Swiss-Prot record:
InterPro entries according to UniProt: DarP, DarP_sf
A GO biological process held by the record: assembly of large subunit precursor of preribosome
UniProt-recorded Gene Ontology molecular function terms: ribosome binding; rRNA binding
Name under which the protein is recorded: Dual-action ribosomal maturation protein DarP
Alphabetical keyword list: Cytoplasm, Ribosome biogenesis, RNA-binding, rRNA-binding
UniProt subcellular location: Cytoplasm
Organism expressing this protein natively: Pseudomonas putida (strain GB-1)
UniProt KW RNA-binding keyword: yes
Family note: Belongs to the DarP family.
Gene (name only): darP
Length: 173
């Protein structure tokens, strides 16, 4: 009599599931090859995987790179993937926060250059350490440059000043 439960297959993964997981490991390995050395050093990786990731840039031919990345995927099987994903997510999050902060400062610069005294007052309220006279002078120079269609050297100085104030206020300086 044939057992209709198929208990022997309940705990096993299908071939498709295994291939999908291996493909995800290869993709994670590809992502790791794009990271800088100091970032890779923070990840909990084996020495063999670190060496394989360093060698990945040497393989430029499509077939060789694909073979090597399959090898990296194989090495990824024994890694602590949860810790790697957690650190990568943390780095993405901090990168996203940095980009949001950067865009916020760019918007402040544009508002100050295109705006009026109200925008300057709002900025000073948000950043109380602002040297009004210096900021007003930088903004005035940037406005003159913009009116004359010159390269935005003064606008860059305004941004640098705003960024320095932001870093000072957040305790990064």
């Amino acid at each position: 009599m044939v057992d209709s439960n198929n208990d022997a297959f309940d705990g096993e993964k299908s071939k498709t599931q295994i291939k999908r997981e291996l493909h995800e490991l290869v993709e994670l390995g590809e992502r790791l090859t794009t990271l800088k050395a100091d970032t890779l050093a923070r990840l909990p990786l084996t020495d063999e995987l670190r060496k394989a990731l360093a060698e990945a840039s040497k393989h430029t031919a499509h077939g060789a790179r694909k073979r090597h990345m399959s090898f990296v995927g194989k090495l990824m099987r024994v890694q602590d993937l949860d810790a790697i994903h957690a650190l990568l997510e943390q780095m993405d999050s901090s990168s996203r926060q940095y980009n949001e902060r950067f865009h916020s400062l760019e918007r402040w610069r544009d508002r100050l250059i295109d705006g009026n005294d109200e925008d300057l007052e709002r900025f000073v309220n948000e950043y109380p350490d602002t040297d009004r006279q210096q900021l007003r002078s930088l903004v005035r120079h940037a406005q003159h440059e913009k009116a004359r269609n010159k390269p935005p050297a003064a606008a860059r100085k305004v941004f640098k000043y705003i960024r320095d104030l932001d870093e000072l206020q957040r305790g990064l300086r």
